[in-house]
Amino acid sequence: MSLHEPEAQPSLKKRRRDSFSNADPKRVKRLHSGTQRLHYHDIGPSVNELKTRIRDVKRLLAKRIDDLPADVRVAKERELAECQRDLEKAEVKKQRSKMIQKYHFVRFLERKRATKELKRLKGQLHKLENDDRLDPNARENSIETLNRKISASEIDLNYTIYSPLTEKYISLYPNERRKQQPMEPEESNVIRTNSGEKPPLWYTVKQSMADGTLELLRDGKLGIGLSGEKKDSNNADVSLKSNTMSLLVHRKQKKPKSKIKVDGDEDAKRSSARSVQEGTRNENKRTSKEDVQGEDDDAESESDGGFFE
């Protein structure tokens, strides 16, 4: 190699790789996962964290309720009630995301079908309105029929979009076409009807279209269930209050020390009954052995000689 020959320059790919050589890929991955965890915790505590906190507060109230000061006890009871409310919200949110993932594919297919049907009906209506060859009375009747079908098709489309995400999705279309085709895995959990009747939530969507509450219906803020009627929310509030105060009631209902004596008497009664049962069992065994021995003696006396005698 001569002295005047220039040194080989590293390639662009090599230079680019060397410029990031100080960054460890594992370290970068750890940093990204850490930011994701921080972002997740910014949203709110998870279901498991809330359950752990509720369990800890319940244990504290159950064990040290007589030793805690009044203000601390009240603060812990409020914290318990808040954690239970947060847990209920977190479970609803988790169930909502689960139902969205479960019925997303079927909603997509039926939304495409409803959109296609609505477009076809509107095309027929446009042609019918511009056709002057038909009788006016017949054309009016046909237009009225098409308008009813278009209205129903619009409700079908809104049903596929705004049906409550927290509830099971009932299919709009009957099962006739799917008898000949294999069912997709995503469609196995969908409730279908062979009669073609509209599900109960279809009429709720129709009413929400008139009221302008489709967004609230989809997010489950109207409290509408699968039957198309409002759910009973009073039971949830009662359960929260009962869970919060059950510890205090359980603690106050403790019996005095006389209960221990009663338990001891019951244990003595059980042990005496057990001993009586064992005695009778032993006597039965003795009598059975004596009977068997007597039968064997009789058999030996009556024996007239066998193969080994």
Swiss-Prot record:
Main localization (coarse): nucleus
Composition skew (Acidic residues), residue ranges: 293-303
Superkingdom, taxonomy of origin: Eukaryota
Subcellular localization: Nucleus, Nucleolus
Region entry Disordered, spans: 1-37, 176-196, 244-309
Bias type Basic and acidic residues, positions: 260-270, 280-292
Composition-biased stretches (Basic residues): 249-259
Membrane-crossing segments per the record: none
Annotated function: Involved in rRNA processing.
Protein name: rRNA-processing protein EFG1
Species per Swiss-Prot/TrEMBL record: Coccidioides immitis (strain RS) (Valley fever fungus)
